[in-house]
Amino acid sequence: MSKEERLAKDITHALGGSQNISNIIHCMTRVRIKVHNDAKVNYDELKSINGVLGVVEDERIQVVVGPGIVNKVAKLMADQSGATLAEETTENQSYKSQAEKRAYEHKKQFQSQRKQSKWNKVLKSIANIFIPLIPAFIGAGLIGGIAAILSNLLTAGSISGQWIQQIVTVLNVIKDGMLFYLAIFTGINSAKVFGATPGLGGVIGGTTLLTGITDENPIKNIFTGEHLAAGQGGIIGVIFAVWLLSMVEKRLHKIIPNSIDIIVTPTITLLLIGLLTIFIIMPLAGFVSDGLVYVINWIIGVGGIFSGFIIGAFFLPLVMLGLHHIFTPIHIELINQTGSTYLLPIAAMAGAGQVGAAIALWVRCGKNKELRNTLKGALPVGFLGIGEPLIYGVTLPLGRPFFTACIGGGVGGAVIGGIGHIGATAVGPSGISLLPLIANNMYLGYIVGLLAAYAGGFIFTYFFGTTKEMRNPE
């Protein structure tokens, strides 16, 4: 029996057996399991399993097994239990087990002190809707970026050839396979989160695309009299509509006789919510999303350096609190309406400031072997925009470096805001990994912002972010 097979078997047993597992997803280092009955889970046994680096007791039980094997363990658990398996993000790293273990120990301690509120539940719902789509966002965004680069080279005359134009066309078709039908994917995932039938959620998402509607035969906005536009209201409207759908469907399941439930319930649900979506939700959500996009672009455009500093400095605490997920639908709305999100490159500076702080700790605390071992695993992935090991394993537990990292993020954000017009064409990772997604060839500006954040985090941490105990541990 391989290590992965043993881990999967032992974890499944500690979770109360295969019958107690509802569904499984995994991120870069964790297997996240939704169980039917939490009382059947033996947490002591789960934590004692050889190969389990940590356990986070949350709405979804998070079992930390480390990078590289997490996808194998998750798949084996799904095969053994028959549970559905979805993938959040994937990673193929081989060195940072100590950093991951330290990070999740502190993360568990931090999360255990937080009171679960309705707001936290809303944030978890938003996260569960969009996290499974992150690989698709990244892949489609990068493909679109390649197509844009080739198109620019064609326009400039640097390259030529009909076959290159065909490649650009094909790449854009692949990209649009994700971005054009995002409302459908959002509807399906929203239905899963809200406990509705996924297919019905997808139909409601597809309804917002107004397929078949032409200028000669439009649907009018009942509030303004103007033609209703395809996708109006964006994913904000889709999420709200599917939430209503879930309540209607659940109610109908209770009152419709079993003999006709399979026919009557989906028909009535789709008809009712479909009409409500087209005539009420789309116009109102469109008003909200348009206003949101306008306000954010105005704040970034008018505020410039000041707005950039505030966003860059305060985004890391939002990540720490789990509040950063609320920005995902905002990024998507910005991209849908303007072609790029100016918010993401500024927010990405928070992670860069933390990298600068980590480099300063490496230089300043050379005698702290434990800290250096943690940094060996956490720092390389920090450059690529994966900041959790640094947050929970290094800066947050130490205290001071977390605040100096925030200042570094503010410095980078101020530079990005000062340069202006630096946007990202897709939602993706931060750090160096975001570079291919930068819009309008503003790559140099983004690099300058990154370097400024690195420098800011380094300088403030080097001079103000360490203590004698950090530098010379006993």
Curated annotation (Swiss-Prot):
The chain crosses the membrane at residues 129-149, 167-187, 193-213, 228-248, 268-288, 299-319, 343-363, 378-398, 402-422, 444-464. Its EC number is 2.7.1.-. One of its GO terms (biological process) is peptidoglycan turnover. One of its GO terms (cellular component) is plasma membrane. It is found in: Cell membrane. The phosphoenolpyruvate-dependent sugar phosphotransferase system (sugar PTS), a major carbohydrate active transport system, catalyzes the phosphorylation of incoming sugar substrates concomitantly with their translocation across the cell membrane. This system is involved in the uptake and phosphorylation of MurNAc-GlcNAc, the principle peptidoglycan turnover product of S.aureus, yielding cytoplasmic MurNAc 6P-GlcNAc. This is PTS system MurNAc-GlcNAc-specific EIIBC component. It comes from Staphylococcus epidermidis (strain ATCC 35984 / DSM 28319 / BCRC 17069 / CCUG 31568 / BM 3577 / RP62A). The lineage of its organism: Bacteria, Bacillati, Bacillota, Bacilli, Bacillales.
